[in-house]
Structures are given as C-alpha cells and as structure tokens.
Swiss-Prot record:
PANTHER family: ATP-DEPENDENT CLP PROTEASE ATP-BINDING SUBUNIT CLPX-LIKE, MITOCHONDRIAL, ATP-DEPENDENT CLP PROTEASE ATP-BINDING SUBUNIT CLPX-LIKE, MITOCHONDRIAL-RELATED. GO terms for molecular function: ATP binding; ATP hydrolysis activity; ATP-dependent protein folding chaperone; protein dimerization activity; unfolded protein binding; zinc ion binding. Belongs to the ClpX chaperone family. CDD domains: RecA-like_ClpX. Component of the ClpX-ClpP complex. Forms a hexameric ring that, in the presence of ATP, binds to fourteen ClpP subunits assembled into a disk-like structure with a central cavity, resembling the structure of eukaryotic proteasomes. Residues 4-57 form the ClpX-type ZB domain. ATP-dependent specificity component of the Clp protease. It directs the protease to specific substrates. Can perform chaperone functions in the absence of ClpP. It comes from Shewanella denitrificans (strain OS217 / ATCC BAA-1090 / DSM 15013). NCBIfam families: clpX, PRK05342.1. Zn(2+) binds at C16, C19, C38, C41. It holds the Pfam family AAA_2. This is ATP-dependent Clp protease ATP-binding subunit ClpX.
Length: 426
C-alpha cells in the first residue's frame, strides 16, 4: 500500500488504504494523515457496528421483562375487548419469560413450559393478541397455518418449517429465535376425524398432532441454514424449541355442543339443540369458558397434544359496539390507517358515526368479525383512492352511512369550500 500513498502524494491516482480500489472505482475517497478510505469501506464499517449493536440490544431488552399489568395495558392499546383472554395471556407470557431468565429455582425445581391454546370464533382477535405480545416483548414472531402441515415424508409443509420461518424473521440468529413466539392458526382443523383410531394414515390430522408434540414440548430441531440448499455442505442449525413459546388458536366450531353434552347445561338435547338469537350467542361464550381437556379429546385432539397446551383462553364473539370501537379506537385502527394514507395526499378523511355503525353491521352480517372490516373499508374507499391523486384542490373526504350502503359517493370538500360527490370529479 506504500506505493499507492506515494502516487497520491505526487498528484497521481489515489487508492483506498483498506480495499485498494482507485479513486475512479469508488464514488468518494476520503483523505486522512497518510491514509485514504473509500465510501464503500465506510459503509462496510457502519454495517459491522450496526450488527454488533443488534447483538447487544436483545440482551438489554431481555433484562427488562414487562409485568402482567404492563403486558395487559399494551394489549389494550391494540386489541378491543377480550379482557379475560388478555389477563390469561399476560400471566402465561410473563411466567414463560420469567422461566427463561431464571431457569431453575434455588431449591432446584425445574419450571415447566406453559404453551397456550386460544379458542374463539373467526375475527375475534386471536392472531392479533399473539402478534401484539411478541411486539411488546421485542421478540421474533412467526405464524403458521396448521391446515398446510403434514407428517414428514408427505406432500405438504413439515412442522420443522415453522422454526425455519422464525429463524427467517431474525436473520437466522439462533439465540434470538429461541426466545421467539410461534402462533399456529386453525389448530382445530387437525383434529382427529373420529373418536376411533383409523387404519388408514391421517397425514393432515392426528399425524400432524403427533409431529407437533415434540416441537411444542421442547426438542432440538435441525434447521438448514440460510441458503442451505445452495450450500448442502453447511452444518444444520440446532434450535432448542423448549425456550420458544407456542400459541395455538382455532375457532373450534361445535365445541360448545360437546361441552353442553358433558355438563348437561344445554337448553335442548345436547347435539340436537339449536342456537338462536343474541341471548344464546352469549351462552355459547359462557359454555366455551367451561371447556375441559376431555371436551377437546372428544372434539378430536389427542390427549398428549392437549397436555402440551396447559393454558387455555377463550375469546368471545365480537358484537356490533366492539366492532365500532375496533374501527376507531386502537392505535392501529383502520380509520387511522386510511386517514394516514389520505394525509399523504394532503386530504383529511372523516368517518361519521353512522358510517362506522353501518360498517360494523355489514361485518356482523358477513360473520367474519374484525377480520372482515378491512375489506369493507377498502371497498368503500377504492374509487376515491383511485381518483384522489389526479383531482386538484381536495382538502377533505367525508364518509357517511349512505356511502357505506352504496347509495352515494364519498363527499369531497375543496379549498374554496365547494362540496361535491367523489364521482363528480375525474
């Protein structure tokens, strides 16, 4: 490198003292006392420092474990209702990470792992609760669909792929992945097809439950590293799943009838009883709250699998008032999200109270819970969002009940206080 420096001193080509590239091969060459550094080497140094900070940060976050009250308060900011489920989750998650921090007690007692089972209708907030908890704890979060899983050796997704997803979320940092949270949705769909074991293989039902057993309880899973297929000679990553918190969720349609039959608390003849009216809907939530392991066995989950999910939380079906709150109150409420999108066009978006009620009623009629709200709002605003970037002078867009019902277009207010329906401008 001595020659390169001499060339620079004599007014000839300058070279980076670190990588040896000439001043013509880089965008910028910074001079120091008898030394030169290029912009590429500066960026590389920044990347190295950022990686080191990333490695230190999780340990600091790990030392600050939120209390159950703090976890519950964080959930309240993003999830409406489900108070009982929030409390159960907050305590279970707090105990799980407390176990990771402390290991065994002074008396040498090993603390067992408490994975969680969430039971509740579609759109009641199961996925959002799990995702929000992971975000509040600053740990990796991965989601899997139980219906896509099959036993090893069959066409479909192996259960080990769940750990692969978790590793991808934290750039294949094994230590970080081992403190993560995995949410497995549609867990009720892998229930055994009948009470009696079948002669034929049930590769997407009981077989998947068997495959998930060790993973959920705790095992050392071998996962191919990043780009493992391209570099088969690389060693597999060893991930200890005993430190990963597994949360399983499902709607468990018809489970209330199984519980009713056991407890003899139904209004009819168990499985023959029909569910009618709002009062009976509330009763279903109460019945699900009385679920016992034997009910889940009768539903089709094998006893060993239920034993790996000792913490059970039931979620209630969201009513119209809860859906209205979901639209406007949480930190990431849909009205706030779309309001932010309109704000980027320098336009204020207003949803009137009657519009929120109409959207909630439409979601109730679709029986999709909170999950259906986004598609409804997207449909209402689609034409306006399409035209808005090309329409000049709009300062405000107003959505009322008639817009939701499709009887009129959104009201656009212009700089000169002129008011027109959205379709009136092209």
């Amino acid at each position: 490198m001595g020659d390169n420096k001499n060339n620079g001193d004599s007014g000839k080509l300058l070279y980076c003292s670190f990588c040896g590239k000439s001043q013509h091969e880089v965008r910028k060459l910074i001079a120091g006392p008898s030394v030169y550094v290029c912009d590429e080497c500066v960026e590389l140094c920044n990347d190295i420092i950022r990686e080191e900070i990333k490695e230190i940060s999780p340990k600091r976050d790990h030392d600050k474990l939120p209390t159950p009250h703090e976890l519950r308060n964080h959930l309240d900011e993003y999830v409406i209702g489900q108070d009982k489920a929030k409390k159960v989750l907050a305590v279970a998650v707090y105990n799980h990470y407390k176990r990771l921090r402390n290991g065994t007690t002074k008396e040498g007692v090993e603390l067992g792992k408490s994975n969680i089972l969430l039971i509740g209708p579609t759109g009641s907030g199961k996925t959002l609760l799990a995702e929000t908890l992971a975000r509040s704890l600053n740990v990796p979060f991965a989601m899997a669909d139980a219906t896509t899983l099959t036993e090893a050796g069959y066409v479909g997704e192996d259960v080990e792929n769940i750990i692969q997803k978790l590793l991808q979320k934290c750039d294949y940092d094994v230590e970080k992945a081992q403190r993560g949270i995995v949410y497995i949705d549609e867990i009720d769909k892998i229930s055994r097809k009948s009470d009696n074991p079948s002669i034929t293989r049930d590769v997407s039902g009981e077989g998947v439950q068997q495959a998930l057993l060790k993973l959920i309880e705790g095992t050392v899973a071998s996962v191919p590293p990043q780009g493992g297929r391209k570099h088969p000679q690389q060693e597999f990553l060893q991930v200890d799943t005993s430190k990963i918190l597994f949360i399983c969720g499902g709607a468990f349609a018809g489970l209330e009838k199984v519980i009713e039959q056991r407890a003899h608390t139904g209004t009819g003849i168990g499985f023959g009883a029909e569910v009618k009216g709002e009062q009976d809907k509330a009763t279903i939530s109460q019945i699900l709250g009385q679920v016992e392991p034997e009910d889940l066995v009768k539903y089709g989950l094998i006893p060993e699998f239920i034993g790996r999910l000792p913490v059970v939380a039931t979620l209630t079906e969201l009513d119209e008032s809860a859906l209205i709150q979901i639209l406007s109150q949480p930190k990431n409420a849909l009205t706030k999200q779309y309001g932010a999108l309109f704000e980027m066009e320098n336009v204020e978006l207003e949803f009137r109270e009657d519009a929120l009620k109409a959207i909630a009623k439409k979601a109730m009629s679709r029986k999709t819970g909170a999950r259906g709200l986004r598609s409804i709002v997207e449909g209402i605003l689609l034409d306006t969002m399409y035209d808005l970037p090309t329409v000049k002078g709009v300062v405000k867009a107003v959505i009322d009940e008639s817009v939701v019902k499709g009887e009129s277009d959104p009201i656009l207010i212009y700089e000169n206080n002129d008011t027109k329906a959205a379709s009136g401008e092209q």
